[in-house]
């Protein structure tokens, strides 16, 4: 069995592809896997590092307005489709799987034209422009958040699979995680705005921590992210007259390296609303306060967060309304009632799909069998 994957640009498009590829390999060890990406995207480093071969094509994303860049991108597409066809004819895949990002556009379009089974996976509640276009050509659209189906009415076939999560996050028991972190009965709140950090998110979170530090009501773990975010956050504490070293119930670090343990031990998570983060939160049934990033394309995170909010698994604070006061109100409302905390966790778990990778693998195999 041969599977060609296309997707990239950001980790949010690459990690689902890797999760699916690794799961297929676990189930069928003789499967040949190949990737297509661009040299400018993160896939250029992540895919080879993960042990998979990759070919590159030249293509860029469309801008949201008419410009020279948009015209240049349009001019690149015929060559990108031709290059994709060449790669496909050489590798001879049984199925081509796209996981989002502009690179999967020409690859899946080329595969569809060559009558090879195709599946595109969309992780966000509001599908990107590439998925919307491809939905008219591919055999199947697998959606990570069920709300997404209403935005792709022209799709031939839509199946809800959820978004793949790291298997390691599913194997940690809550009681063992809390024991490992030496937690007591106080609510344990973890806060992170992403691996690169988020300036305004971090400022508000730091201000909230300062406002509750002396109450010792919570155990708090905050990951600031990189790009000098840690220094900026620590300066924020200093400006507020708070020395976090004096509080054994507050931990501030650049990155939360034991995220599997921390997430499972947490009573409440405060985070952005990227699709991968939400997949993990719901897979383990974790209540959350979501602060969607206003800086992402098509306001994806707002749509993602509102979907979880409607399901009763999270509260949402728009960044424009984010402050120590709004965070405190949301945290207090959730953790003050054990019943509400449990109810939100249950609702979150109802939206989770821990076996997402298996579901997608099943669809991939179904497409291959159907084409035999």
Q: Where is each model-derived feature located?
A:
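Active-site-proximal region of nucleotide-activated glycan assembly enzymes
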Residues: 31, 42, 53, 112-175
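A short, well-ordered alpha-helix in the C-terminal region of glycosyltransferases
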Residues: 340-354
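Acidic donor-binding loop of glycosyltransferase active sites
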Residues: 93-95, 256, 260-277, 286
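Conserved donor-binding/catalytic loop of nucleotide-activated donor transferases
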Residues: 114, 264-266, 280-292
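Conserved nucleotide-sugar phosphate-binding/catalytic loop shared by glycosyltransferases and other
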Residues: 3-7, 30-81, 193, 320
């Amino acid at each position: 069995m041969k599977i060609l994957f296309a997707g990239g640009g950001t980790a949010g498009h690459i990690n689902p592809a890797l999760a699916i590829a690794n799961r297929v390999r676990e189930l069928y060890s003789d499967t040949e896997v190949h990737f297509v990406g661009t040299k400018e995207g993160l896939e250029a480093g992540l895919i080879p590092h993960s042990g998979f071969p990759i070919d590159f094509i030249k293509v860029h994303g469309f801008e949201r307005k008419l410009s020279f860049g948009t015209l240049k991108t349009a001019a690149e597409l015929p060559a990108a489709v031709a290059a994709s066809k060449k790669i496909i004819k050489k590798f001879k895949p049984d199925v081509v799987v796209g996981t989002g990002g502009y690179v999967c556009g020409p690859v899946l379009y080329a595969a569809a034209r060559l009558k090879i089974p195709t599946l595109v996976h969309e992780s966000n509640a509001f599908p990107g422009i590439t998925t919307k276009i491809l939905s008219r050509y591919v055999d199947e659209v697998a959606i990570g958040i069920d709300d997404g189906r209403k935005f792709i009415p022209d799709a031939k076939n839509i199946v809800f699979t959820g978004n793949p999560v790291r298997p390691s996050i599913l194997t940690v028991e809550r009681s063992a995680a809390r024991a490992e972190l030496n937690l007591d009965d106080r609510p344990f709140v973890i806060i992170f705005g992403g691996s690169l950090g988020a300036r305004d998110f971090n400022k508000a979170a730091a201000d909230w921590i300062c406002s509750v530090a002396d109450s010792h009501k919570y155990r708090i773990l905050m990951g600031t992210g990189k790009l000098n975010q840690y220094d900026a956050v620590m300066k924020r504490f200093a400006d507020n007259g708070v020395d976090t070293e004096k509080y054994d119930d507050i931990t501030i670090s650049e990155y939360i390296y034991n995220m599997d343990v921390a997430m499972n031990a947490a009573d409440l998570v405060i985070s952005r609303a990227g699709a991968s983060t939400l997949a993990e939160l719901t897979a383990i049934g974790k209540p959350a306060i979501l602060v969607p990033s206003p800086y992402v394309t098509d306001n994806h995170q707002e749509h993602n967060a509102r979907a979880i909010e409607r399901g009763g698994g999270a509260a949402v604070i728009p960044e424009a309304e984010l402050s120590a006061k709004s965070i405190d109100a949301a945290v207090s409302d959730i953790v003050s009632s054990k019943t509400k905390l449990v109810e939100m966790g249950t609702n979150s778990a109802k939206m989770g799909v821990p076996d997402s990778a298996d579901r997608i693998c099943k669809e991939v195999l179904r497409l291959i069998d159907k084409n035999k």
